[in-house]
Regions:
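Nucleotide-activated sugar donor-binding and catalytic core shared by glycosyltransferases
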Residues: 1-378
Length: 378
C-alpha cells in the first residue's frame, strides 16, 4: 500500500471542481501526496493523473445512461484494476452513487479506505441503502445540513462538512458583473442555465429559447446570457440557437457566477446550479425535463414534495418549480415575468433564498474534507 497516493473519482463537472479544491487543501497538509483516477479540467489542473476523463462519463437519467453502459462498465473495471495494481491508501469518491458505490464495494475488498464526499440522496429515495453504504464507506462527508442526522443509527460514520458553495463571498452589484462581461448596463438581462450535459441541453434549451421569445415580446430591450459549462463546446447550443435568430443571446464560456450576477432573473435547470444562483442572490425559476422513462421510474421511487435544492433546504416552496409538461415555454415566461414585474414576489423569493444561504454552514468545506482524508491516511 502506498501511503502517499490516493485514488479520486469525480464523474461530473461539479464533482471535479469540489474534488480539486479538496486535493489542493490536502496538499497543504500532506505536500507529497499523489492522486490518480477519474477527473475533469479542475482536477487535471490540480495535478491528478487522469486515467479517465470526466467528460466521457457525464450522463443523467436512465434513458441517457443506457447507451453508455459499456463505457461506464469499462471505466469501472479499469479503476478496479488500477486500484488493485497501485494499492492507494485512500479513495475519495465524489457524488455519482450508482458508479461510486459499486466501485467502493471492490475497494473495500482490496483494503482501501473509502471517503465518500457528497452523500447520495438516499433521503429522497432508496432509504434502505444506508446500511449497505455502511459496509463499503469508511467516512461519509455530507454537504447538506440535515444529512448527518439522517445517517444516525444506520452504522454510517457521517459528518456535515458544510457546503462547498458556502466558501463564496457575498455577491456584488449587477452593474459590476455586467461591466465585467461587457454587457450593456441598462437593459433587462435574463440568464439561461440549461445544464452541463448534452442530454439535458437537447431537452431543456429549446423550450427555454421559446420562453425567451415570449419574454422578448413584452420586453423588447431584453438580452439573454448563457454560461457554457467547461465540459461542453458552444457548438452543442448552436442548433437550437439557429432557430431563434431574432433573439440576442450571448454565450459565455464558464463564468456562471458572473452571468447570474449580471441578471435580473434566472431560468435555471434543476440541480446544483439552483444553489449557485441562490448564493448569488438572484431570483429564479427552476425547470427540469427528463426522458419519460426516467420520469416514470423517478415518480415510483422518489418520496419528496420538492425537487429544487433551494426548496428542499428551505422545507417549503421558495422558488417556482416546473417539471416535465409544466416546463412549457408559456409557464417559464409567465413565471419570469412575475419576477420582473411584481416587487413583492421578487422580495419574498430573495428573503427565502437568504435563509437557505445561512443553512449551508461555515466556509471551509474543502479544508474539512482534506482533514478527513488525512485522518485516515497511514
Amino acid at each position: 500500500m502506498l501511503p502517499d497516493e490516493i485514488l479520486i473519482v469525480a464523474t461530473e463537472a461539479s464533482a471535479d471542481l469540489h474534488a480539486a479544491r479538496a486535493l489542493e487543501e490536502l496538499r497543504k497538509i500532506r505536500p507529497g501526496i499523489r492522486a490518480f483516477g477519474v477527473g475533469g479540467p479542475c482536477l487535471r489542473a490540480a495535478g491528478l493523473e487522469t486515467l479517465y476523463p470526466t467528460e466521457d462519463l457525464s450522463v443523467m437519467g436512465l434513458a441517457e445512461v443506457l447507451p453508455k453502459i459499456p463505457k461506464i462498465l469499462g471505466v469501472l473495471h479499469g479503476m478496479r484494476e488500477a486500484a488493485a495494481r497501485r494499492r492507494p491508501a485512500v479513495a475519495l469518491l465524489v457524488d455519482s452513487p450508482d458508479f461510486n458505490l459499486r466501485l467502493a464495494k471492490h475497494l473495500k475488498r482490496q483494503g482501501v479506505k473509502v471517503v465518500y464526499y457528497i452523500s447520495p440522496m438516499i433521503w429522497a429515495w432508496r432509504r434502505g441503502r444506508a446500511r449497505k453504504i455502511a459496509q463499503v464507506v469508511d467516512r461519509m462527508l455530507c454537504i447538506l445540513p440535515f444529512e448527518e442526522r439522517f445517517y444516525e443509527g444506520t452504522g454510517v460514520s457521517a459528518r456535515f462538512v458544510g457546503h462547498p458553495f458556502a466558501e463564496r463571498a457575498l455577491p456584488g452589484d449587477v452593474a459590476g458583473y455586467r461591466a465585467a462581461l461587457g454587457l450593456p448596463a441598462g437593459r433587462t438581462t435574463i440568464a439561461l442555465l440549461p445544464g452541463s450535459r448534452r442530454s439535458e441541453i437537447d431537452r431543456i434549451f429549446p423550450p427555454m429559447l421559446d420562453a425567451a421569445e415570449r419574454i422578448k415580446a413584452r420586453h423588447p430591450d431584453v438580452q439573454f446570457v448563457v454560461p457554457v459549462a467547461v465540459t461542453l463546446q458552444e457548438g452543442v447550443l448552436r442548433p437550437a440557437l439557429s432557430r431563434h435568430a431574432s433573439l440576442e443571446v450571448r454565450l459565455v464560456s464558464g463564468r456562471a457566477d458572473e452571468v447570474v450576477g449580471a441578471s435580473d432573473a434566472v431560468l435555471v435547470k434543476s440541480g446544483t446550479s439552483t444553489l449557485e444562483t441562490a448564493l448569488m442572490q438572484r431570483p429564479m425559476v427552476v425547470v427540469y425535463k427528463m426522458a419519460w422513462l426516467s420520469y416514470w421510474v423517478a415518480r415510483l421511487l422518489v418520496r419528496m414534495s420538492h425537487f429544487a435544492l433551494v426548496n428542499i433546504l428551505a422545507g417549503r416552496t421558495v422558488v417556482p418549480e416546473l417539471l416535465q409538461q409544466e416546463a412549457s415555454p408559456e409557464r417559464m415566461a409567465a413565471e419570469i415575468e412575475r419576477l420582473l414585474s411584481d416587487p413583492g414576489a421578487r422580495r419574498a423569493q430573495l428573503d427565502g433564498i437568504a435563509e437557505v444561504r445561512r443553512s449551508l454552514g461555515e466556509p471551509g468545506a474543502a479544508r474539512r474534507v482534506a482533514e478527513e482524508i488525512a485522518g485516515v491516511l497511514p
